[in-house]
Amino acid sequence: MNKEVLSNQALKKTHLVSCEVFDRRLEEHLKPSQKKDQQISLNLINTRLWLNDLGQKYNRTVTVDTIPDEAWVEKLNNYDIFWFMGIYLPSQFSANHAKKYTHQYTYALPDINPDKDVVASPFAIADYLPNPHLVESWEAWDKMVKKLHEADKKVYVDFVPNHTAVDHPWAREHPEYFIQGSRDQFLKNPNLYQAIGGQNGQTHYLAHGKDPNYPEWSDTLQLNYGQEVVHHIMTEKLLSLVEHVDGVRCDMAMLLNPSTFLRTWGWTLNEEEKQYIQNHQFWQEAIPKAKAKAQSLNKLDFEFMAEAYWEKDVLAKNFDYIYRDELYKHLVRVARGENPYHLKEHIAHLLECAQNQGQCKDTVYLENHDEERAIKTMGKEFSQAAAALISFLPNTMLLINQGQDEGRTIRPPMQITRSPQEKSDQQLKSYYQNLLQLKQSKLFREGQWSMAKAHGQATNLIVLEVISSDQTIKALVCINMGKNQTQAYVPQQNNYRVISSYQLNKNLYSHLENKETSFNLNLAPYNTELIFFAS
């Protein structure tokens, strides 16, 4: 055997050994990270729908504290936090109001029965007590929370500070807690007010809850934050929740900012009330109190997530997470054919912001209970690429809506208690499982992220780079956001050499031949490929 053959065999043997060493090293870096403050995954659970689904599956009544262990298995594997929506005492007024619009819910339930299927909005809260149809008591609720804590998971619930249900006891007992109008104002604008009989026999005209840019929510009443007592009682409600959960998602949080509240309701307030609002920002005062109570209960990282669409810089001073609806809007526009230039700029901005660990983090999503299903808005293939993109963004919380990870296409109205009949998309379900477990790894959670360069005509290609904390492993996350095949080449990564790749859409792992200068990238439409390097 000549020297050249021996040399080639030696090189092959060395390459195999190198691959084995790399595989072991990569395997270690792809193990789940114990660090839970980056790339967090949150599952939004419509509690009524999920328990109803489980009840049908197991042919028995299922409450929060009697959910079978097997129903938790996939969720515990995929998610860090569970946001239970709609757990509070339901409003009968809201349920009756919703039945007037039964015809609007038939797209989800063609055979809808208004007496059985239509319920109150989860955001028209009659009181911050458990809905007895879902969980008997806070003690029973705490039993479920304890089980999730044992699995190292967290639980969020809603806090809706802007308004109450129309039939909340305060409406009759304490009408002074609400924005009020006169009888003449009620007659001129009956849609804005609700006539409520007080305990003294007097009729009060209480305003419905409102966003300044949209019509009023007719099953709610607007709390008056110009009153010190309202700040106090709502802070007390918030503090009571701290005992039972690990965080709260704060509904329409920006509505309580002084500038927004005055823009919406300033015309109804006296000068003393206006001055009080300007001098007492609710979140600035209430959140530190809630966190102090949490610490006294040994909950050291109680969290606040804001649903907010403006004045985020104000909220960011106190909140831990805020909705990133700008990213969602960029993705929708690209899905509809817009050049992804602005999307790339926005991603670069988010990566830069992630370097500042102290600031409020983003909650990113493709859909939620308000938005249309991602498959409907973006198409199945694009939604997969978009899911990969937002999943790997560092220092964020990824929100996955109930049914999104199964490929559901029908968005359930908030006022129904039975899920639309749909079959799960098994391919999409597997895709999300692979993606969600991959993003939990040490490499992706603990690594340093940045934008990477790829050369060529790949307009729709987005490449993210992550380097492991010990700098021995590097990965490029290459995502084709377009409908055409994408080709590009990636320069050699300094002291790193490419060894393997993982095609997320195919769940296919492959060894790659070493390249000294660069390697060619050839991505199918809407596909994601991860290229791994070793130092």
Give the label of every model feature segment.
Residues 2-535:
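Active-site and adjacent substrate-binding regions of carbohydrate-active enzymes
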